[in-house]
């Protein structure tokens, strides 16, 4: 997401809009879907029709230890499905919840997810289906320290900036279903781009956020020789370090194109520098989806290619 200090007011506005919705007010986008993202659909279960008392955004007083003790972690992408403790508290003891808020008890804010399956097409991994309540649960949209969550921030950023081609890592496939849900709720709540003087002009010719066709693609991850994912939190090698050591744009683009399979089978080819125009000229999703396994970086070959 865009650096939070410069977008804090926009994220706050988005959360305030969502907070004005009750759970039953978004039942139409749950049961019939919304055309803001044509490659996806929703299928609602029975729970959505019986959750009228549940606010869409609600406070959560649980600690991380509480959640770990009551939840079963999901495999692969580190998702832990929230057990719904405070959602039940809001429904069964609303006055107790209000009193805790009045006492300034530390709390985060969560979005209530529905008994709903969201289906979308991914350019690399094909048709994806996730049940919001079972596979994802009610996730935090604002932490107890006031920081807005990644899930809310990227959804707001994409909607605000009119992004129509969403490309992330394959570990965020499950998150994409949640972001579709949040996006639909934001549109229902009347969210508007922060800079209306810059018209929304998606490539497909539509002119409103709820008309636009969105393309989703999730790419294989890059692992080191030990099988650990390269990530900022692990202080993995990044573009700043590469450019500081003299790596050229053509070298970097060529290496990325090679990793994506645009220069042939990774086992039988070596990366070759190329320009952005050259990479675009050979790009196709068919080539990328030929090999959807995570890539393992050979540090010696990597260093030799970049002259490190």
Predicted features and spans:
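Conserved catalytic-core subdomain
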Residues: 226-308
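Short coil/turn segments at secondary-structure boundaries
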Residues: 62, 83, 292-296
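Alpha-helix boundary/capping residues
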Residues: 18-25, 74, 183-186, 246, ...
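Active-site cores that bind ATP or allylic diphosphates and position pyrophosphate for catalysis
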Residues: 33, 40, 49-54, 64-231, ...
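Alpha-helix initiation and N-capping motif
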Residues: 8, 64, 79, 83, ...
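Conserved alpha/beta enzyme-core scaffolds, especially Rossmann-like or related mixed alpha/beta domains
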Residues: 1-33, 40-66, 216, 255-281
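A general structural signal for well-ordered secondary-structure junctions
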Residues: 24, 53-58, 76-80, 92, ...
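Generic recognition of short, well-ordered alpha-helical interface segments
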Residues: 9, 13, 106, 174-177, ...
């Amino acid at each position: 997401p865009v650096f939070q200090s410069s977008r804090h007011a926009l994220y706050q506005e988005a959360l305030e809009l969502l907070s004005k919705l009750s759970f039953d007010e978004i039942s139409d986008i749950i049961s019939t879907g919304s055309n803001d993202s044509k490659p996806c659909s929703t299928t609602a279960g029975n729970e959505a029709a019986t959750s009228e008392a549940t606010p869409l955004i609600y406070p959560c007083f649980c600690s991380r230890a509480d959640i770990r003790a009551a939840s079963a972690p999901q495999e692969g992408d580190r998702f832990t499905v929230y057990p719904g403790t405070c959602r039940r508290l809001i429904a069964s003891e609303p006055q107790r919840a209000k009193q805790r808020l009045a006492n300034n008890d530390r709390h985060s804010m969560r979005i209530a997810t529905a008994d709903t399956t969201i289906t979308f097409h991914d350019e690399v991994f094909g048709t994806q289906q996730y049940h919001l309540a079972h596979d994802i649960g009610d996730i935090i949209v604002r932490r107890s320290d006031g920081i807005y969550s990644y899930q809310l921030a990227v959804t707001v950023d994409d909607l605000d900036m009119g992004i129509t081609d969403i490309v992330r890592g394959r570990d965020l496939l499950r998150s994409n279903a949640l972001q579709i849900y949040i996006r639909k709720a934001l549109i229902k709540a009347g969210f508007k781009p922060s800079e209306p003087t810059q018209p929304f002009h998606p490539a497909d010719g539509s002119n409103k956020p709820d008309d636009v066709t969105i393309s989703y693609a999730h790419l294989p991850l890059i692992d080191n020789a030990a099988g650990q994912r390269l990530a900022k939190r692990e202080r993995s090698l990044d573009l700043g370090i590469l450019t500081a050591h003299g790596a050229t744009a053509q070298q970097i683009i060529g290496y990325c194109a090679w990793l994506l399979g645009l220069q042939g089978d990774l086992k039988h080819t070596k990366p070759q520098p190329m320009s952005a125009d050259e990479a675009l000229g050979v790009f196709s999703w068919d080539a990328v989806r030929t090999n959807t396994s995570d890539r393992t970086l050979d540090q010696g070959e990597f260093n030799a290619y970049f002259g490190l």
